[in-house]
């Protein structure tokens, strides 16, 4: 929130935050701050300055009270620990497309491959390939004009054990449900081999995995 708006999180005036922490009371910012309806954030400001502004990856800053999405569409994400079904997977896919539009409504000109919040079963699993794929697409589409890309990796969030489990077992899970085939943008086997060669453990794979995903984006920028 602070990086997107330049405001201290405790200065948020989003409705969801003020409902929990009314003005004049002790502020406790956590999962209760969202981008305000004034759209005063880096995406909107740079858009006004002529930039294409893209958002990929983890969002988790939607103010659910400043619009009617909840009443129109129900929950904006699938319930935690819901039983997997093909129908649920299709709903996850459709919700991610709605989430893209909500991110754009809040100030960005382009959004894709969105994680709405924290990872939740049955779609719990990191997939930096999926985030990087959207980042590369945005850069390619806007390489001939000024652009700003906000890329948020889920790998910044633990627990560490989930990094290794995701890397070895969950190459199909994404923020839009399960893919039909892996993206294979990052060599996961190589990540694990280099971690072991460095004398590190499963608990550290997320750092190198994230580094490789960011490397894809930096390499793309170097090509321009």
Give each language-model segment a name.
Residues 1, 12-17, 64-70, 121-124, ...:
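Short, solvent-exposed loop/turn and secondary-structure capping segments
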Residues 87-106, 110-224:
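Active-site-proximal cap/lid insertion segments
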Residues 4-9, 70-80:
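Short, hinge-like loop/turn segments at secondary-structure boundaries
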Residues 29-30, 56-62, 82, 86-87, ...:
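Active-site neighborhood of divalent metal-dependent phosphoester/pyrophosphate hydrolases
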Residues 7, 59, 154:
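Active-site metal-binding loops of divalent metal-dependent hydrolases
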Residues 1-41, 45-55, 64-66, 110:
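Active-site segment of extracytoplasmic enzymes that catalyze sulfate/phosphate-ester chemistry
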Residues 54-56, 62-64, 72, 148-152:
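Outer-envelope exported proteins of Gram-negative bacteria
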């Amino acid at each position: 929130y602070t990086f997107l708006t330049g405001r201290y999180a405790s200065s948020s005036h989003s409705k969801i935050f003020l409902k929990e922490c009314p003005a004049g009371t002790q502020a406790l910012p956590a999962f209760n701050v969202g981008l305000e309806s004034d759209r005063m954030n880096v995406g909107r400001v740079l858009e006004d300055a002529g930039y294409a502004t893209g958002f990929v990856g983890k969002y988790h800053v939607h103010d659910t009270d400043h619009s009617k999405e909840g009443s129109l569409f129900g929950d904006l994400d699938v319930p935690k620990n819901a039983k997997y079904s093909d129908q649920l997977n299709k709903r996850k896919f459709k919700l991610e497309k709605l989430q893209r539009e909500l991110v754009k409504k809040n100030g960005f000109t382009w959004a894709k491959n969105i994680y709405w919040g924290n990872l939740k079963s049955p779609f719990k699993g990191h997939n930096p390939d999926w985030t990087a794929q959207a980042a590369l697409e945005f850069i390619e589409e806007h390489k001939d004009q000024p652009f700003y890309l906000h890329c948020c990796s889920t790998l910044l969030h633990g627990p560490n054990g989930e990094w290794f489990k995701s890397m070895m077992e969950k190459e199909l899970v994404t923020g839009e449900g399960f893919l039909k085939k892996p993206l294979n943008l990052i060599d996961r086997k190589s990540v694990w081999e280099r971690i072991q060669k460095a004398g590190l453990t499963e608990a550290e794979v997320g750092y190198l995995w994230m580094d490789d995903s960011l490397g894809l984006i930096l390499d793309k920028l170097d090509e321009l």
